[in-house]
């Protein structure tokens, strides 16, 4: 026999404005993807800027040596 319910069972979700936990959780993969893409774009477009080279890129372990400027003595003007 089928058990009948007297009325609909409502559940209140905790929210902040129109944001609730399941909604925010569904956006996390997109935010991670676009955040990584934005970080990659910033890294690409600031690679040639000396301020970024000295501040960030030279301090990267193992790969930081690529951005350290060390010219040959023959190439330096006197």
From Swiss-Prot:
Keywords: Electron transport, Membrane, Mitochondrion, Mitochondrion inner membrane, Respiratory chain, Transmembrane, Transmembrane helix, Transport. The chain crosses the membrane at residues 27-46. The keyword Electron transport applies. This is Cytochrome b-c1 complex subunit 10, mitochondrial. GO terms for molecular function: ubiquinol-cytochrome-c reductase activity. GO terms for cellular component: mitochondrial inner membrane; respiratory chain complex III. Belongs to the UQCR11/QCR10 family. InterPro entries: Cytochrome_b-c1_su10_fun (IPR019182), Single_a-helix_sf (IPR029027).
